């Protein structure tokens, strides 16, 4: 007697072990877990073949060998089907309904109606389009960071190496490596520029010819080409320790400023970044001025007067670190107009100091002013919030509010500031279009809305309306959100904090509500037959500081006005919830339906009577107007007849026969 196990026949030698598959016994797994695992026909064939071989060798190897083989088959099968068992996370249905299907990227090349005759050429162009960078994308931003590093390196170290010969000669191998690495990055950036898309009529251009023409006809292209001219060949004519021949590399500065601009847009701390950026500019200006001061001192002669750098033959001033720090110190004192430096002696020294003073007055005054403005902007939020607190304090003192209430209000303000809840979301987002505001609101409040039972599977348009109408509210410890018997005008969704359902004494707790819970959603629908009506059935009190989202009844009714089908669905879902909880009076529902029918019939009768009255009035007006019209027509006919008779008599008197008869 043989028995099938997962499609495999067992040998007679193993019939005594037919109650469960050996692999399942060895692993301690249940039979239903193995049977529920998806597997293909190829897996069954493989396992069947291996087990068949095991059955042949079973008399020689025994029961343990067969178990090991079947166990190995189970492991292999589980590994092979691992990827098939893993399901991709499903996209959220709320966002799916709101965003709709994804649009495929359309380029200007695809939209101009020109197709390629050769399929291979078309495929090649498609491959090239894959390498077009979106200037708003992350890859482009990462490349800006890469290219900004060699630009900053050249701007800081080229001038220092050109002025401080010890710096150049002491590490010239390191400088050669860094120089040519930066040159490679510059050349790569030239090709990246040729593959960087731009927007035309709102679409990203990926046509290589358009990209090339758009870049080549700009001034930046000429500067980029000039920055990679191999001026290093001049090394063969002059000394290798002449880094000034590479000053053309400084022309690639635009990339560094572009990186700074995009970082300022992307960062969550723009004020801190702006201040850091200005500090960097100050340091670079001071650094350049220090290098130029050292170069002027070298050209005039070290130690020839009190203004130039001291004689380098003095051991105290003859090493590189002291040279640079001394020049940096002199540059800082001069540019910040602090003074306390030796006065100039020669004319060229006077001119240089005058130029430095102008830079210090104009540029540094501007920079320091910007820093002060940024710091003021950073404190603007705090100042505005403090002004609100002061106004409330003044009001409470004027109205002689108790000290306990005053302390409670101050603690509430402190909680708002500490937890960064002072931001007015509507004021911040008012400059965005409605579509973006709705999408941001959905991303922020999505997890909260999914907790509300009546809003499951509602229309995307209604969901957008409701999301935009959610209003955050913060309650202090001990505050009542609602009291028993109050008319329900809002529903609440708990974002953070804990609420307690308490007795009338305010102390005894019946239940505890935490983040994600919601209440009051049924009362704002005015469902007929509800035993609760539209009144609160419990006292709900905040245990600590609680953040809630509030949706008022008026806002809900305003939103569902344009969605009558959604309103019916919400009411039906509310009735289902009340029926499950035993809070729906079906007799009252039937009675209310009869009352509604009677009311509708009464309204119909009233409307019919009004219609009859209006029709009779219109008919009377029509009859009167018709009589007046007939009278006017009769008058006109009479006048026409009289006029015709007068014309006939006048024509007869003027005829020739009558004239001849009248002659004697």
From Swiss-Prot:
Residues 460-580 are annotated as: Cyclic nucleotide-binding domain. 3',5'-cyclic GMP binds at residues 520, 523, 536-537. Residues 380-456 are annotated as: C-linker. Residues 337-340 are annotated as: Selectivity filter. It is a multi-pass membrane protein. It catalyses: Ca(2+)(in) = Ca(2+)(out); Na(+)(in) = Na(+)(out); K(+)(in) = K(+)(out); NH4(+)(in) = NH4(+)(out). GO terms for biological process: calcium ion transport; monoatomic cation transmembrane transport; potassium ion transport; sensory perception of smell; sodium ion transport. The record marks 364, 368 as: Central gate. PROSITE patterns: CNMP_BINDING_1, CNMP_BINDING_2, CNMP_BINDING_3. SMART domains: cNMP. Residues 167-176, 242-246, 297-319 are extracellular. Keywords: Calcium, Calcium channel, Calcium transport, Calmodulin-binding, cAMP, cAMP-binding, Cell membrane, Cell projection, cGMP, cGMP-binding, Coiled coil, Ion channel, Ion transport, Ligand-gated ion channel, Membrane, Nucleotide-binding, Olfaction, Sensory transduction, Transmembrane, Transmembrane helix, Transport. 3',5'-cyclic AMP binds at residues 536-537. Gene3D superfamilies: 1.10.287.70, 1.20.5.300, Helix hairpin bin, Jelly Rolls. GO terms for molecular function: calcium channel activity; calmodulin binding; cAMP binding; cGMP binding; intracellularly cAMP-activated cation channel activity; intracellularly cGMP-activated cation channel activity; protein-containing complex binding. The chain crosses the membrane at residues 145-166, 177-197, 223-241, 247-265, 273-296, 320-354, 355-379. Residues 597-651 form a coiled coil. It is found in: Cell projection, Cilium membrane. InterPro entries: CLZ_dom, CNG_cation_channel, cNMP-bd_CS, cNMP-bd_dom, cNMP-bd_dom_sf, Ion_trans_dom, RmlC-like_jellyroll. Belongs to the cyclic nucleotide-gated cation channel (TC 1.A.1.5) family. CNGA2 subfamily. Pore-forming subunit of the olfactory cyclic nucleotide-gated channel. Operates in the cilia of olfactory sensory neurons where chemical stimulation of the odorant is converted to an electrical signal. Mediates odorant-induced cAMP-dependent Ca(2+) influx triggering neuron depolarization. The rise of intracellular Ca(2+) levels potentiates the olfactory response by activating Ca(2+)-dependent Cl(-) channels, but it also serves as a negative feedback signal to desensitize the channel for rapid adaptation to odorants. This is Cyclic nucleotide-gated channel alpha-2. It comes from Homo sapiens (Human). The gene is CNGA2.
